[in-house]
Amino acid sequence: MAAAGVVSGKIIYEQEGVYIHSSCGKANDQDSLISGILRVLEKDAEVIVDWRPLDDALDSSSILCAGKDSSSVVEWTQAPKERAHRGSDQQSSYEAEWDMVTTVSFKKKPHTNGDAPGHRNGKSKWSFLFSLADLKSVKQSKEGMGWSYLVFCLKDDVMLPALHFHQGDSKLLIESLEKYVVLCESPQDSRTLLVNCQNKSLSQSFENLLDEPAYGLIQKIKKDPYTATMVGFSKVTNYIFDSLRGSDPSTHQRPPSEMADFLSDAIPGLKINQQEEPGFEVITRIDLGERPVVQRREPVSLEEWNKSLDPEGRLVAVESMKQKIFRGGLSHSLRKQAWKFLLGYFPWDSTKEERTQLQKQKTDEYFRMKLQWKSVSEAQEKRNSRLRDYRSLIEKDVNRTDRTNKFYEGQDNPGLILLHDILMTYCMYDFDLGYVQGMSDLLSPLLYVMENEVDAFWCFASYMDQMHQNFEEQMQGMKTQLIQLSTLLRLLDSGFCSYLESQDSGYLYFCFRWLLIRFKREFSFLDILRLWEVMWTELPCKNFHLLLCCAILESEKQQIMAKHYGFNEILKHINELSMKIDVEDILCKAEAISLQMAQCKELPQAVCEILGLQDSEITTPDSDTDENVGSPCPVSAFPSSTLPILAASEAKDDSPTQTLASPNACRLTPA
């Protein structure tokens, strides 16, 4: 047989003593034990599971299998002294990959001259191998029933012979496979593991995105440094891709250089198109005018807050207080009280007595929900796979959330227990969403400030109302935000956008983590407290967090373009900004951008909608004519008398710099 298309591969798992129990005939109740060797082999983006009788596997340096047309041979080789250890933790090269496995049909062993394998060796007919991309499910044996075994079921419903692990270690194989695919328990059968279960897949995608060590792995596909800088996000984008791409085999293998474009094609609404097509809004050359220079103020103090309360404890001049919080934040002693208003737990116009009654009501409601999961017996939980999965994820995440913060450090920390209980109770509050990786990041600062389980829960529930779409399976919120961010950045600096597009970075995937958990991993813990409370004022405009993204990217533009960063370098650079961003500087820049846009009289409608700058009628106090009725004029969220603007000539040297929008034009595909 011609050995055309020979390629080498690496054994990443190997186990001897894996048997097939074949029946010898109806008259014999005994099984015939066929000893074999099981291997998992990796080559590029394809992972192969191979079992063959021990007689056929003696020469492990050359394993041959035919392709679909039997015209090519794939040779899996193992270099000397490269023999893999058992298990899945010995190879690092597969821990950071796109998980894009080429679909290959089940491959039978090649025959020669029409002879079946059984003509040469009766055991050989049991040999099999398959691509991991074809795996549908794995059936496990019951515990305590002798030798453990696994049964592989493929996507074409082919059921392979059961593999009995006489020497144990079947769990090591499962762990190895989980490096490449997501396995989760079937709702119908706890012994069956399904491949790529979407609920768990999404959570694990977020886990890889948010797991700091994953970002440090220097793992590559074809020595592509992309995977070294964005392994976590690659899994998230691949999750989106897998859920949308369908079964077209032609889409299952793409070179890394095409991946950004292909992912964007797979996600509806994430396409930037510079061709003229019906339904697109043209963002023409727009002069945004000079960018105002703004200054921050001191945080609102507890004394200042108390002076704003009437005798019944009702806050007066709410909008004025929000503006003060936006421009300066809150003193820490005030956060426990003010955050409840900012997050909607307490109504702004409520009295002290009304808030006391509300807290009593919410306390009862919270503990009723908490009792629901606390009262579930172990036997009941075994029959509730979703609750069991939620608990497992929460326990895993709680043990690694902000552990350097004194509030959460150490073993058996009360803060960790509260974090766990609040997240479990939230699963009862919103069982459809349950728990997804990243939620613990949103809760941690809230619990730290509130120091109270009930108050922290209701503040978290309110925050999740805002963030809910970020964690839904379809991730519509994330898609929309990426589109909107692209729209805003292009208006501000289309030249920079064009550069990013030329480097396959125009879809701003590197901002995914920023948006998903509102910069939680990008700033220090104390800076996040300040940043979040400013954003919760919902000033100076809608989607202010997108302008924060623009401000950060604008600050990094010079280095990215001057050093000619490519796709990989951009991703790496953005990732390494974590904990290095000045929160006050970025807040100043983002506010200045919002004011610059609000003062522009020719702002595109798409941008007005993103920022919530509604069109209004221009009228004059001394005129009752309708001459100017209908003229568009974006309106700032700030009253004109309170705009914290300085003329450029009055700016201090350390004030945010001013830039003007690039004049280039583009088209944006609507979401």
From Swiss-Prot:
The modification Phosphothreonine is found at residue 669. It holds the Pfam family PH_RBD. One of its GO terms (cellular component) is cytoplasm. Its main location: cytoplasm. It is found in: Cytoplasm. The keyword Phosphoprotein applies. Residues 329-539 form the Rab-GAP TBC domain. The modification Phosphoserine is found at residues 23, 32, 70, 205, 257, 623, 655. InterPro entries: Rab-GAP-TBC_dom, Rab-GAP_TBC_sf, SGSM1/2_RBD. GO terms for biological process: regulation of GTPase activity. One of its GO terms (molecular function) is GTPase activator activity. Keywords: Acetylation, Cytoplasm, GTPase activation, Phosphoprotein. Signal peptide: none annotated. Residues 650-671 are annotated as: Disordered. The modification N-acetylalanine is found at residue 2. The keyword Glycosyltransferase does not apply. Ubiquitous, with highest expression in heart, liver and testis and lower expression in brain, spleen, lung, kidney and skeletal muscle. PANTHER family: TBC1 DOMAIN FAMILY MEMBER 15, TBC1 DOMAIN FAMILY MEMBER GTPASE-ACTIVATING PROTEIN. Acts as a GTPase activating protein for RAB7A. Does not act on RAB4, RAB5 or RAB6. Interacts with non-phosphorylated form of RAB8A; phosphorylation of RAB8A at 'Thr-72' disrupts this interaction. Interacts with ARMC12. This is TBC1 domain family member 15.
